[in-house]
């Protein structure tokens, strides 16, 4: 079996031959990998376009990541900036725009190994929060990189709690300017990407003060560096925050402002305006100014959050069919480590999660596009549900993708600790997503507030609006309670309706429990804030169950749309079953708590779960192949399509500069140390 034509090889000595163990995995296909790739891409035409973009990117030496693992922080920054420069030139020449998919595919091909990514977030926030006049002025400048912009929200002393941001924007009616000021050291903007060395402008989130009144957080466009010589502008203290756990190519920065003045027109004014005399006009809800962050959060899901787990699964699964270790019987040869049930237990839940989260994120993106159009027209009906879905999905996906990528790394043993495996950089990059665009615990608790309100509405509590129908994502809260799981055999747990209902039951019970505890504290005399703080652990548990239920439900609904693809539907159903059952077994206490599941039924679920592992094993390589990552995109000695792990790992190690550079420590320390011992012999 040869390597498919669309796969751009690394061009090394091993790319032209397939490892026999890898070839055997692809010999008998139970489904069309190409067709599954098309489904994941949203159609064959999108697959073709993506591969065309990838061939352009990988055919250009300016985009090579060959020596990334041996580079210093400065070298990584320069390489990432070089790639952005050449990508922008290609985009201009080819006519690629944000309205098309080419730039999205280019980012995927480059594994987001680029600088100036915050330009896209700036533009999304501008379109969400800016007036038509502001968009007309600033969007062309951003699209063509006449300015380089970042999104500066997080401060040294505040992150997810936006109401606590300290940066102030005080309106001066005499000059019709806003005075942007960092009143304390903790008000210093801290962490924005591209701010440290690159940005010329920043979209600043600050507390608006006009006519002596505080009006909450609003967005302002603030120039920070000269467009002539890139020096900081007056009143601006700016720089790089220093080394980080990962993402070393990005210049995360700090920004302190000392009474910096910007024109009145620099406050984004789709949902709020300050008139020349200082009068404040509110055009949206209190949540409107969070829209820019919501837009960013939704668009991160498939790329920055899910993609690292998908890549980690590809690398670890491919390595697991090449690595032979231990015998199943004393007289047998060593087997592929993927034959071990424990290795399957490590990897297959992560693989199932990749597919579950893909369908969850694409479904959310569809809902977002519908709701976003309404919001821009100042119809905020869908905003609460969209906010809850986006925050919960981001929190759950980033939590599980981080845990899953680390699980894949550990499943590769010692080689997974090598940067050359590609796994450490995947782990550190996705770990960052647990805190950027909202710390996950805080996000879960925002979901919990939505659940409490929805539960009160469903049950007709005083003060609720029970006459209105519940949002679709929480409609299960109004369904009749299913007191007991009807499963009688292990095979019953292969029924999507059964395990989806089980997850709905647990999510509803935990939500009702959280409401009960909250109300009990209120009735005992606690005020609403104290009562909330004393029940946040229970609320957190309910929010997590709700989010997992949504992921199971969305996977089930995606399967129902694949009736014309029976082979693919069958193999994906196994992953859906595994995803649901893995969650049940991991959280079995929640299902046993009220007797919904019996101990015997948990045993049945475990039997069903273990029966799935050998079935998924047969298709594991094919299911990871369907993600269709090129070898350049993976940049892993362990995860190449051809499976030649050991040859490539040995060859890549030879490229380490330390193997050819003189070792100054030898003459300074090692030689004297050896000589001191020799003199005593």
Curated annotation (Swiss-Prot):
Coiled-coil regions, chain positions: none
EC number: 1.17.99.3
Matching SUPFAM superfamilies: Acyl-CoA dehydrogenase C-terminal domain-like (SSF47203), Acyl-CoA dehydrogenase NM domain-like (SSF56645)
UniProt-recorded Gene Ontology molecular function terms: 3alpha,7alpha,12alpha-trihydroxy-5beta-cholestanoyl-CoA 24-hydroxylase activity; FAD binding; fatty acid binding; flavin adenine dinucleotide binding; palmitoyl-CoA oxidase activity; protein homodimerization activity
N6-succinyllysine PTM sites in chain numbering: 66, 137, 453, 561, 667
Top-level EC class as recorded in UniProt: oxidoreductase
Catalysed transformations (reactions): (25R)-3alpha,7alpha,12alpha-trihydroxy-5beta-cholestan-26-oyl-CoA + A + H2O = (24R,25R)-3alpha,7alpha,12alpha,24-tetrahydroxy-5beta-cholestan-26-oyl-CoA + AH2; (25S)-3alpha,7alpha,12alpha-trihydroxy-5beta-cholestan-26-oyl-CoA + O2 = (24E)-3alpha,7alpha,12alpha-trihydroxy-5beta-cholest-24-en-26-oyl-CoA + H2O2
Cofactor or coenzyme needed: FAD
Record's keyword annotation contains Phosphoprotein: yes
Localisation per UniProt entry: Peroxisome
Annotated Gene Ontology cellular component terms: peroxisome
Tissue: Liver and kidney.
GO biological process, any: lipid homeostasis
Residue window of motif Microbody targeting signal: 679-681
Keywords assigned: FAD, Fatty acid metabolism, Flavoprotein, Lipid metabolism, Oxidoreductase, Peroxisome, Phosphoprotein
InterPro entries on file: ACOX_C_alpha1, Acyl-CoA_ox_N, Acyl-CoA_Oxase/DH_mid-dom_sf, Acyl-CoA_oxidase, Acyl-CoA_oxidase_C, AcylCo_DH-like_C, AcylCoA_DH/ox_N_sf, AcylCoA_DH/oxidase_NM_dom_sf
Phosphoserine: residues bearing it: 9
Superkingdom per UniProt: Eukaryota
Subunit (UniProt): Homodimer.
Job description of the protein: Oxidizes the CoA esters of the bile acid intermediates di- and tri-hydroxycholestanoic acids. Capable of oxidizing short as well as long chain 2-methyl branched fatty acids.
Family stated for the protein in its record: Belongs to the acyl-CoA oxidase family.
Protein's UniProt name: Peroxisomal acyl-coenzyme A oxidase 2
Protein's organism: Oryctolagus cuniculus
Classification lineage: Eukaryota, Metazoa, Chordata, Craniata, Vertebrata
């Amino acid at each position: 079996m040869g390597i498919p034509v669309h796969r751009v090889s690394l061009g090394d000595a091993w790319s032209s031959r397939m490892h026999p163990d890898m070839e055997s995995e692809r010999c008998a296909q139970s489904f069309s990998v190409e067709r599954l790739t098309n489904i994941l891409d949203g159609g064959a035409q999108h697959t073709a376009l993506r591969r065309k973009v990838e061939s352009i990117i990988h055919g250009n030496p300016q985009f090579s990541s060959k020596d990334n693992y041996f580079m210093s922080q400065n070298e990584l920054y320069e390489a990432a900036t070089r790639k952005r420069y050449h990508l922008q030139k290609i985009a201009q020449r080819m006519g690629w725009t944000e309205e098309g998919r080419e730039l999205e595919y280019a980012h995927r091909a480059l594994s987001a190994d680029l600088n100036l990514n915050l330009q896209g977030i700036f533009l999304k926030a501008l379109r969400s929060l800016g007036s038509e006049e502001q968009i007309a002025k600033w969007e062309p400048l951003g699209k063509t990189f006449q300015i380089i912009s970042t999104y500066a929200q997080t401060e040294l002393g505040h992150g997810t709690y936006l109401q606590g941001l300290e940066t102030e924007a005080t309106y001066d009616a005499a000059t019709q300017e806003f005075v942007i000021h960092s009143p304390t050291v903790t008000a210093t903007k801290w962490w924005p990407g591209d701010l440290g060395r690159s940005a010329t402008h920043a979209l600043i989130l600050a507390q608006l003060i006009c006519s002596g009144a505080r009006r909450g957080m609003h967005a302002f466009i603030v120039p920070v560096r000269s467009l002539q010589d890139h020096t900081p502008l007056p009143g601006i203290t700016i720089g790089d925050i220093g080394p980080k756990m990962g993402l070393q190519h990005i210049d995360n920065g700090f920004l302190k402002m000392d009474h910096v003045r910007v024109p009145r027109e620099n406050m984004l004014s789709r949902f709020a305006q300050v008139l020349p005399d200082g009068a404040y006009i509110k055009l949206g809800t209190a949540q409107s100014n969070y829209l820019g962050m919501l837009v960013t959060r939704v668009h991160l899901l498939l790329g920055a959050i899910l993609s690292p787990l998908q890549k980690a699964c590809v690398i670890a699964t491919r390595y697991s069919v090449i690595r032979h270790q231990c015998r199943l019987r004393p007289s047998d040869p060593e087997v592929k480590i993927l034959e071990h049930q424990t290795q399957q237990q490590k990897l297959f839940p992560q693989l199932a999660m990749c597919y579950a989260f893909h369908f969850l994120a694409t479904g959310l993106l569809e809902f977002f596009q519908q709701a976003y159009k309404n919001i821009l027209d100042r119809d905020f009906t869908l905003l609460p549900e969209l906010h809850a879905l986006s925050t919960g999905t981001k929190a759950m996906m980033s939590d599980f993708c981080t845990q899953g990528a680390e699980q894949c790394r550990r499943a590769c043993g010692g080689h997974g600790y090598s940067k050359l495996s590609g796994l450490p950089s995947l782990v550190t990059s996705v770990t960052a997503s647990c805190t950027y665009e909202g710390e996950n615990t805080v996000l879960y608790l925002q979901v919990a507030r939505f659940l409490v309100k929805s539960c009160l509405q469903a049950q007709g509590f005083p003060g609720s609006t029970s006459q209105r129908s519940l949002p679709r994502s929480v409609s299960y809260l109004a369904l009749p309670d299913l007191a007991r799981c009807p499963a009688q055999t292990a095979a019953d747990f292969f029924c999507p309706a059964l395990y989806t209902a089980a997850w709905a039951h647990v999510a509803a019970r935990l939500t009702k429990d959280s409401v009960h505890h909250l109300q009990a504290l209120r009735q005992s005399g606690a005020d609403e804030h104290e009562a909330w703080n004393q029940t946040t652990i229970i609320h957190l548990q309910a929010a997590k169950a709700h989010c997992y239920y949504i992921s199971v439900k969305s996977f089930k609904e995606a399967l129902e749309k694949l009736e014309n693809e029976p082979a693919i539907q069958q193999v994906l159903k196994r992953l859906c079953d595994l995803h649901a059952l893995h969650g049940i077994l991991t959280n079995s206490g929640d299902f046993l708590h009220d007797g919904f599941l019996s101990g015997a039924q948990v045993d049945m679920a475990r039997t069903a779960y273990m029966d799935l592992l050998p079935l998924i094993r047969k298709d594991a390589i094919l299911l990871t192949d369907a993600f269709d990552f090129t070898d350049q995109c993976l940049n892993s000695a362990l995860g190449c399509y051809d499976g030649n792990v050991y040859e490539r790992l040995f060859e890549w190690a030879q490229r380490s500069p330390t193997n050819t550079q003189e070792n100054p420590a030898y003459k300074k320390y090692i030689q004297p140390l050896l000589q001191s011992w020799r003199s005593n012999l």
